[in-house]
Design a protein with these regions (language model features):
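Non-Sec secretion/translocation targeting segments of pathogen effectors
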Residues: 1-49
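Acidic/histidine-enriched segments that form metal/cofactor-coordinating
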Residues: 44-52, 97, 124, 131-245, ...
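His/Glu-rich zincin catalytic helix
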Residues: 39-130, 163, 170, 243-352, ...
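C-terminal structured "cap/appendage" subdomains that terminate the fold
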Residues: 440-453
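Peptidyl-prolyl cis-trans isomerase
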Residues: 85-87, 148, 363
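Short cationic amphipathic helices and targeting signals
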Residues: 152-156, 251-262, 374-379
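Extended amphipathic alpha-helical segments enriched in small hydrophobics
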Residues: 373-405
Length: 453
């Protein structure tokens, strides 16, 4: 299982709520200079005790992604990284928190996903307002996802009103920095999350992928799904568990916010510094799952009553380090060679067994230097499992002794460049590429992608 994606809402409404501008509150009361100047009282004024000073920030550089796209890079004084990429189209405000299920002790497995759910259930900054109602008023979309190593949240829409961008950033910052974690909401969300866990466990693909990760990296866990966790874990969670995990992982220096769309970087950064002003630092050592790659092949056959004469096959390999942009480009080239050309290396295999073979790279650890995983996945009839595996291994082995021809290499490069151009056009795809690259410190993957190809 790659990730769990949750709430998605959309609306055609174009009304944007007007958030009142806050007046700065002096940190120290001034003494009146004369009797005439002294103010005895102020009527019709509601004090706002939540006003905070904007966070100072520095510009750390620029990344030229293409002829038309340049990323402006900043760092807030609290350690949070911010990247802003002006472009036409939808504006996406997205924050990547560098934590996931591999940062959870096994008895808390699933808490990252559970917290992701609960961040939509109200924040101190939002007050009595309902998050989804405010998003709907802007005609915006919102969603989140949890994976092995990262949890991300976004709000996206076209900017139809002058206040839309500020409202989006304010809502987004509030949910990530100051969730209420109300007891009644926490208990209610357990039922929803447990239903999702049961759904995940009913799908052979999730079980197979999880077991591949466990076997490849020697991970011991009582949960059959490493991202979703177990219903026993979720049911037993206390509010203290939630608050402690949140405080120890959701701190500014562990987050990257990326904004792509029709924005002015300077003005946008002022808004970010106004609302992303947390001073939080972790007070405990973070948990990192021990990942020890196996030194010899492991095969495990799992019997499922849901297979109906078919078998799902997962073949896992240790992949490149998260921060190794050059090798990640090579993985993309390998995928293209194997299955994304008109006459790919897997074409005859897929035709012979009437199936398709996918290859995906997954970030497992939140540490930049740790290895990723490469997984081949397919489905075949039960009777074809053994001959298919033999042919699959043979096809993979041939690549080592029969590298791409010049014709294949040219086709691979053209295909990769076309794919690169396509994701540059989409705000969401561009945002994801920027966020994942910045998390792992491989900015060259953004600025030198075509050169590496």
């Amino acid at each position: 299982m790659n990730y769990i994606q949750n709430y998605r809402i959309s609306s055609n409404s174009v009304y944007a709520p007007k958030f009142g501008a806050s007046n700065p509150v002096a940190g120290k009361e001034s003494q009146p200079q004369s009797k005439e100047q002294e103010i005895k009282s102020l009527s019709n004024v509601t004090p706002d005790y939540g006003v905070k000073a904007p966070m100072s920030y520095t510009k750390t550089g620029e990344l030229k992604i293409s002829d038309d796209l340049t990323a402006q890079c900043y760092k807030l004084a609290n350690g949070q990284k911010v990247v802003i990429v002006p472009k036409d189209g939808t504006t996406v405000v997205k924050t990547y928190v560098n934590t996931g299920s591999m940062n959870e002790p096994d008895n808390l497995r699933g808490i990252s996903h559970y917290i992701e759910h609960n961040l939509f259930n109200g924040s101190e900054d939002l007050g009595d307002k309902v998050f989804f109602d405010e998003v709907n008023k802007m005609g915006a979309n919102t969603n989140a996802s949890t994976s092995f190593s990262v949890t991300d949240y976004y709000i996206s829409s076209n900017l139809l009103d002058d206040t839309d961008l500020e409202n989006k950033i304010k809502l987004h910052a509030g949910m990530i920095q100051s969730p209420k974690f109300l007891l009644d909401k926490l208990e209610k969300e357990k039922n929803i999350v447990n239903s999702e866990i049961n759904m995940c466990l009913s799908e052979d693909e999730n079980i197979g992928f999880t077991q591949t990760v466990k076997n490849l990296f020697n991970i011991k866990s009582s949960s059959n799904d490493l991202v979703a966790g177990s219903t026993d874990n979720i049911t037993a969670l206390t509010r203290d568990d939630v608050v402690n995990y949140f405080n120890n992982n959701y701190y500014p220096a562990n987050m990257t916010t990326v904004i792509t769309g029709e924005v002015n970087p300077d003005e946008t950064m002022k808004l970010v510094s106004k609302y992303f002003n947390s001073q939080k630092v972790p007070n405990l050592n973070r948990h990192f799952e021990t990942m020890t790659p196996i030194d010899k092949p492991i095969r495990q056959d799992l019997i499922s009553s849901k297979s109906e004469g078919g078998a799902s096959i997962f073949l896992g390999f240790v992949g490149p380090e998260n921060n190794n942009g050059e090798d990640i480009v090579k993985v993309n080239a390998l995928y293209t060679l194997l299955g994304d050309l008109a006459n790919s290396r897997f074409s005859s295999l897929e035709q012979k067994y009437s199936t398709g073979v996918s290859l995906q790279k997954e970030r497992i650890s939140s540490k930049p230097n740790d290895n990723s995983i490469l997984v081949f996945e397919t489905e075949v009839k039960d009777d074809y499992v053994e001959p298919f595996l033999k042919d699959l291994y043979s096809n993979i082995s041939k690549i080592a002794v029969t590298p791409p021809s010049e014709k294949e290499l040219t086709a691979i490069k053209n295909k990769m460049k076309m794919g690169h151009d396509r994701w540059l056009e989409c705000s969401h795809a561009l945002n994801h590429a920027v966020g994942s690259s910045i998390l792992d410190g491989r900015s060259e993957y953004l600025s030198k992608y075509n050169e590496m190809i």
